[in-house]
Amino acid sequence: MVRVTTMLASVTLLTRNARAATPALAVLALGFSLVPIVLLHLLTIETMNPVRDVISDYVFPDGGAVLLGCASLSLAAASLLARQVLLANGLPRLSLESVLLALWAAGLVVATFFPTDPTRFESSFSGAVHRYAGATMFVSLPLAGWLLARRYREATALRWLSLAAGIASFAFLLAHLPLLENSVPEFLGLFERVLYALLYAELFALVAVAKSEVDA
């Protein structure tokens, strides 16, 4: 009986330690996902215009698909790690927040394996899937963050970053409507990079909320 009790205590301790380490793993995954993006920017500085060209266009230079894929999959992993921490600390698995975080991560994975089309080229099946995945991503994460901030009242930073990301996402998606396709702004790439900066900031704030739940 004593041995069983000791084993159960050890398992409980390991579970707690793993749960406590998960937010740190999420931060590491977020940081790692930025490395390929920085490399892509440096490697394509003479061939791509970061003000005009969107991030998805990094798939076209040699090696770009691999680096961009690493960034997207690392970002998805970080998001799922943060989600798992929240689930382990009481967030219902089928709550809207949980589903939206899963959709954001799924959108990243789908967009990775269905690359975009070159700007102003006729849309392919892969390009269409990529755009729908992107739309899912840009709607899901800001809304998830906003709802989580309502659930965790102390998450002020998450609330405002989610609002800013939501407004930026809405404006960015407007530029991709079919009626506006022929008047895509020349600064679309810069605008998307600002949007991603907000999304990253939101994710770091989300991980902070998850960590506070572990520490509570």
Go through each PLM region and give its residues.
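Hydrophobic, aromatic-enriched alpha-helical segments typical of multi-pass transmembrane helices
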Residues: 13-212
